[in-house]
């Protein structure tokens, strides 16, 4: 068994308290029952009479604890699976959050760098614009001082203006390129957002699958519990079947003994019949003739008694008393003569048959069954089935197991008498179920 093992001394040792179940408890109870049978066969029932109720209470308590242990182990396993699932979800979310933060940091860094470039470009353009404005003002002031230099100054102004226009065009192209980059990055951000939404939807789908798996796991555990309950029921039925097999074997042994006795009696009767045919003193009268003679004798005795009573009434009291005494003595003598005559004609077997027939002819006493009528049924009533609906009780499976194991046998095949096993069965079931709860509360 998974919860126990035998050491070198032959003692049963507990392996792991977390692995013990109800089936292990019933196996242990079966082993204890076998040990009790060996002890009772060797030392008798008195050696275990005080220990049996304590052992039964202990096994009931162990059965309750094993059932509670199975429920707690199932609950702990469910909680562990839930914790593992939550931890895996937490790690997945943390990894996804870390990647998302990293991508956001990269995008934000790129945006900062581009923004700084644009700010530097704008500041440089503003400086160039200020320089051009100042240069234009200087040219206008110098044009008032020297008019002769107007043509050359005009050409220089035109060339400078063309140069500024060319630089402005180049700056515009740069700005246009930057705008295009900004639009491109915006599109990329939108694409990343769509990918993020897809990841979220995929995560939701995985969560739904996880819920389905959890539901299937709960269903599997429920089926496992049902299977455990069926195994427990099968163990109890197995114990019932073993007890029934033991009862049947005892009944078979008893029937075999009765058959042997009947065969022996039959042989004795056949032998006595053969001896009676050769016996010269065998009965000369049939049963019917002997019955008629006895009935006729009884009628005559009754008539004599009636006539003596009538005669006593007609005579004086003193003569009636003496006559009555003489009548009693004469009747006794007549009875002795009749008995002697019967003894001379019949043997001892005829006398026994005559006495039996006389007893049959006598009127029945008060409370006795008259001849020709069936006698009332006597003896123990048949046993009621254990699965009768009116016999449902709240006793534990351990008590039922020991009730079947130590049931009162109906034969004498065992080494100890019937009453001892019956006493042991009652002793094993003497402890009330409340004692188990009391002992559990004490622990």
UniProtKB/Swiss-Prot annotation:
SUPFAM superfamilies the UniProt entry points to: RILP dimerisation region
Compositional bias per record (Low complexity), positions renumbered to this chain: 356-368
Classification via Pfam families: RH1 (PF09744)
Domain RH1 residues, every copy: 8-96
Subcellular compartments: Lysosome membrane
UniProt xrefs under InterPro entries: DZIP_RILPL, RH1, RH2
GO CC aspect terms: ciliary basal body; cytoplasm; lysosomal membrane; perinuclear region of cytoplasm
GO molecular function: dynein light intermediate chain binding; GTP-dependent protein binding; small GTPase binding
Regions of compositional bias (Acidic residues) in chain numbering: 332-355
RH2 domain span: 282-401
Coiled coil: 59-315
GO terms of biological process kind: cilium assembly; lysosome localization
Stretch list, region Disordered: 311-394
Swiss-Prot/TrEMBL keywords: Coiled coil, Lysosome, Membrane
Superkingdom of source: Eukaryota
Function according to Swiss-Prot or TrEMBL: May have a role in lysosome distribution by interacting with Arl8.
Recorded family membership: Belongs to the RILPL family.
Oligomeric and partner information: Interacts with Arl8 (in GTP-bound form).
Name of the protein described by the UniProt record: RILP-like protein homolog
Originating species: Drosophila melanogaster (Fruit fly)
